[in-house]
Amino acid sequence: MEKPSLPKGTRDFGPAQMLKRQYLLQTIREIFTKYGFLPIETPAMENLSVLTGKYGDEGDQLIYKILNSGDFIQGVEQNHLQEGYKKLIPKISKKALRYDLTVPFARHVVMNRNDITFPFKRYQIQPVWRADRPQKGRYCEFMQCDADVVGTDSLLCEAEIVLMIHEAFAALGITDFVVKINNRKILSGIADAIGKEGSEAELCVAIDKLDKIGKEAVLEELKTKGFTDSQLTRLLPVFDLKGNNAEIFPLLRTILAQSSVGLKGIDELEKVFTLIEKSGLGNASIETDLTLARGLSYYTGAIFEVKILNVQMGSVCGGGRYDNLTGVFGLPNVSGVGISFGIDRIYDVMNELNLFPSQESNSTRLLICAFDENTFMHALPMVTKLRAQGINTELYPDPVKIKKQLSYADDKKIPFALLIGEDEMNQGLYSLKNLISGEQFKVTFDEVVHKLI
């Protein structure tokens, strides 16, 4: 018999891990709710036509396609195989697992536009799937935790995303992080300025890999996309623009002086910083990063990434403004902006930094140990009453040897045990044992409740 295993890039989560994940998700969920976001869910699978063409060619290749039911190769001819996967896939697959939550959200908005109040603020916490190469912090199945606003182009939404990020990380105990922000209009302006107008998509896809493959490899990739040595030479100074906004923006305005779209991007970025400061977050951990590109093709305005410092991990949040994502589904001119929290990466960072609280409050607090069938039956109503008082209580399911029952409590780190023998049952005085200190007391039932609440 073949030994069972998991697909690469996927994981099981045991109780200890799930309690931590629930704490993390609930903390962020409460922040979303505070800012007026409401929850939705969408199916794990979407029609393939909904997903393809929204993430660029590289993203499309990472979508998990679902083979058609039955004889899925029926109708496939030799020429389809020779023409490559783009011709073959539509013949054998009509559905796919969702790649992210943003595109399904756009589809949801279009299908439910008559029932939605705009601006529509939604959050969504569900798994997504990507046929990526697994490595530290990168999985094939992972949880996304998104918040988006659609139906307004107000830059207040971008500012509130930054505020929400800061509040969420403060609640989680993460203090050493930076929010990187750029604007896709600036990147379009840079393409214009170096004489490569209309090539911002290729530029963004390449720049997005800067942290992964380095500057030289990015330049080589751009050469393969038709960028000349002269154009790349003019691009290099932009990579090196560092400092605060008072230093960066004047230089950038000079570089992009002939690009109206680039100048508009600078104006938008400055307005976002002003709104953040006016909201009272003057010491925000936020910086302009002109090499931030976000490879996804649907972004049109502000783009965000969050990195936790002094930890070997990629970005833990990402998002941006998209002006016409719903347009491909027949609802044009609906602007939106959103952020996605990388729950799995944040979880790994919090584990590494030991930021999760003790799990004692979420687990069993008292184990009732009965000696025999009579004391077992006597304990049943006690369990119900203790639970009604809000005390997490278990009754060991079999009246076996007390040593085995206490071993169970020890393995589950249950702090108290209530021992009920024949004498205890008859006297109404029970032995309450503190399994951490070893102390043991004789108590009435009411005293048990009083000690554990």
UniProtKB/Swiss-Prot annotation:
Q: Which GO terms of type biological process are on file?
A: histidyl-tRNA aminoacylation
Q: What is its EC number?
A: 6.1.1.21
Reaction(s) catalysed (UniProt annotation): tRNA(His) + L-histidine + ATP = L-histidyl-tRNA(His) + AMP + diphosphate + H(+)
EC top class, as a word: ligase
Q: Which GO terms describe its cellular component?
A: cytoplasm
What terms describe the molecular function in GO for this protein? ATP binding; histidine-tRNA ligase activity
CDD domains of this UniProt entry?
HisRS-like_core, HisRS_anticodon
What are the record keywords, sorted? Aminoacyl-tRNA synthetase, ATP-binding, Cytoplasm, Ligase, Nucleotide-binding, Protein biosynthesis
| The keyword DNA repair is assigned to this record | no
**SUPFAM superfamilies cross-referenced by the UniProt entry:** Class II aaRS ABD-related, Class II aaRS and biotin synthetases
Give its localization.
Answer: Cytoplasm
Q: Which InterPro entries match?
A: aa-tRNA-synth_II, aa-tRNA-synth_II/BPL/LPL, Anticodon-bd, Anticodon-bd_dom_sf, His-tRNA-ligase, HisRS-like_core, HisRS/HisZ, HisRS_anticodon
- Entry's HAMAP family? His_tRNA_synth
The record's annotation in PANTHER family points to: HISTIDINE--TRNA LIGASE, HISTIDYL-TRNA SYNTHETASE
The similarity comment for this entry is: Belongs to the class-II aminoacyl-tRNA synthetase family.
Q: How does it assemble?
A: Homodimer.
Q: What is this protein called?
A: Histidine--tRNA ligase
Organism this protein belongs to: Cytophaga hutchinsonii (strain ATCC 33406 / DSM 1761 / CIP 103989 / NBRC 15051 / NCIMB 9469 / D465)
